[in-house]
Amino acid sequence: MLRDAVDPRLGGEGLIRDFYTKWFAIDLAVRDLFPPDLGGQFTVFSQALTWLFGELIDQRAEEPVAFLAQLGRDHRKYGVVQSHYFSMHEALYTTLRAKLSDNWDDKLDDTARAALELFIGVMRGAADAEQGPPFCDGTVVELNRVSRDISVVRLALDQPLAYFAGQYVTVQVPQWPRRWRYLSPAMPPDPDGAIEFHVRSVAGGMISPTVVGETQPGDRWRLSNPHGGMKIDRDGGDVLMVAGSTGLAPLRALIMDLTRWGVNPRVHLFFGGRYPCELYDLPTLWQIASQNPWLSVSPVSEFRKNPPWAADYPDVQPPRGLHVHQTGRLPEVVTKYGNWGDRQILICGGPDMVTATKEALIAKGAPAERIQHDPLAG
């Protein structure tokens, strides 16, 4: 019953909206921690609660506890303090009880209290136990507009950020205070605090068009809390990577990380875009491949020829030494070579591309458990 009450497919976002209204009324200071538009927050929180209640119903606690601990650590960047968790507990309990008043009894009350004690207790405890700063700031030192919709942004951080190659971090830009976006570093962690991001302007988006169109050297960004677990097991066999556009970033970070060792599994990277000119990082990939024989790179574009606007941006024609450029959609191009079932498979890019590529590989016979990708939005 608790799960159904918060399920967005069953109208649960209305309850979440009521919860936030009550929370802000109980604790006025909380409202200033969130962006003005909370529509996306309602959806995300509704989905998270639905999953958490479902896991508890099925008596699975390990993943929910890990998720809640990460959530608690992550909320430190918003300025959430211990007192906010107590007001959150009160608001959520009161909202659930009001929503389910017709069915509320002692058993449901005990269940709700136990669940909320777990949810909020784990978050509060994890946040309190975290010793490091909740975020680190950095200065944009270089901006390269490598295509009409893509920018490469390099920053110098005030202090090094702890993350692993292949992870993504939350980023806040000065034009959009209190709004955080996930971006994947395109390089392994640097002891001197250098970091690089590849950003594509998404039509209808708020933050990515600003980053691509308005970012200037000297801008101050705020970064926090790495997430994600994409990785390469150097003893786990050869590797297939499929990167769509700026989805290249975390895969390139993993490739660069592998260059620390002399012996590695073979890695075959398919790097795709709409047009040849959007394969913006081919020169870097060629440089890495020329010095590391375990790396193969296949450039792929949906269209064979570039549009007229390509003349305004750097030439990224594949240099000699890379595989022949291929035309087509990534799922079809990748799977025409087989199912790659003997490989560790990593896919990164837009949700539609990731889903289509994963489904195509599984349909060909690739084991689903061998496929890694970050959580899909939407």
Report residues per predicted region.
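Short, conserved phosphate/pyrophosphate- and ester-handling motifs at nucleotide-, phospho-/glycolipid
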Residues: G166, G247, G350
